C-alpha cells in the first residue's frame, strides 16, 4: 500500500511540475524526503529531470501538443520529435 501511495504522489508531482506550478528542485527535495538516496529514488529523480527539461512536450517520439511543429515553422521546416527532443527537418531514421 505504501509503495502505491508513493507512486501516486510521484505521478501527481510530475503532473504539477509539467503544468509549471512548482519547479524541479522542489520535487527533487520531496523525492529525497520520501525515498532517500536509493536506486528507486535515483530513478525517480532522473525521470523528473527528463520531464522538466522537455520544453516542447515531445513524449515517446510524438508531438502531443504541436509545440515542436510550431517551433520549427520559424525555420520553414517540419518538426520531428526524437524521444523527448524536438529536431527541425530531421525525420526519424528507424
From Swiss-Prot:
<keyword id="KW-1053">Target membrane</keyword>
<dbReference type="GO" id="GO:0090729">
    <property type="term" value="F:toxin activity"/>
</dbReference>
<keyword id="KW-0964">Secreted</keyword>
<dbReference type="GO" id="GO:0042742">
    <property type="term" value="P:defense response to bacterium"/>
</dbReference>
<dbReference type="GO" id="GO:0044218">
    <property type="term" value="C:other organism cell membrane"/>
</dbReference>
<keyword id="KW-0929">Antimicrobial</keyword>
<feature type="signal peptide">
    <location>
        <begin position="1"/>
        <end position="19"/>
    </location>
</feature>
<comment type="similarity">
    <text>Belongs to the long chain scorpion toxin family. Class 3 subfamily.</text>
</comment>
<keyword id="KW-1052">Target cell membrane</keyword>
<comment type="function">
    <text>This full-length protein shows antibacterial activity against B.subtilis and K.pneumoniae. Also shows a potent inhibitory effect on the ookinete (ED(50) 0.7 uM) and gamete (ED(50) 10 uM) stages of Plasmodium berghei development. In addition, induces cell membrane disruption, leakage currents and cell death on HEK293 cell line (tested at 25 uM).</text>
</comment>
<dbReference type="GO" id="GO:0005576">
    <property type="term" value="C:extracellular region"/>
</dbReference>
<dbReference type="InterPro" id="IPR029237">
    <property type="entry name" value="Long_scorpion_toxin_alpha/beta"/>
</dbReference>
<protein>
    <recommendedName>
        <fullName>Scorpine</fullName>
    </recommendedName>
</protein>
<keyword id="KW-0800">Toxin</keyword>
<dbReference type="Pfam" id="PF14866">
    <property type="entry name" value="Scorpion_toxin_alpha-beta"/>
</dbReference>
<dbReference type="GO" id="GO:0016020">
    <property type="term" value="C:membrane"/>
</dbReference>
<feature type="disulfide bond">
    <location>
        <begin position="72"/>
        <end position="88"/>
    </location>
</feature>
<keyword id="KW-0044">Antibiotic</keyword>
<feature type="disulfide bond">
    <location>
        <begin position="68"/>
        <end position="86"/>
    </location>
</feature>
<keyword id="KW-0732">Signal</keyword>
<keyword id="KW-0472">Membrane</keyword>
<keyword id="KW-1015">Disulfide bond</keyword>
<feature type="disulfide bond">
    <location>
        <begin position="58"/>
        <end position="81"/>
    </location>
</feature>
<feature type="domain" description="BetaSPN-type CS-alpha/beta">
    <location>
        <begin position="55"/>
        <end position="94"/>
    </location>
</feature>
Amino acid at each position: 500500500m505504501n509503495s502505491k501511495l508513493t507512486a501516486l504522489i510521484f505521478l501527481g508531482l510530475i503532473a504539477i511540475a509539467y503544468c509549471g506550478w512548482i519547479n524541479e528542485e522542489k520535487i527533487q527535495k520531496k523525492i529525497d524526503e520520501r525515498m532517500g538516496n536509493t536506486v528507486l529514488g535515483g530513478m525517480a529523480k532522473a525521470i523528473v529531470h527528463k520531464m522538466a527539461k522537455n520544453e516542447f512536450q515531445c513524449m515517446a517520439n510524438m508531438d502531443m501538443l504541436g509545440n515542436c511543429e510550431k517551433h520549427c515553422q520559424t525555420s520553414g521546416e517540419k518538426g520531428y520529435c526524437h524521444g523527448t527532443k524536438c529536431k527541425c527537418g530531421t525525420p526519424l531514421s528507424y
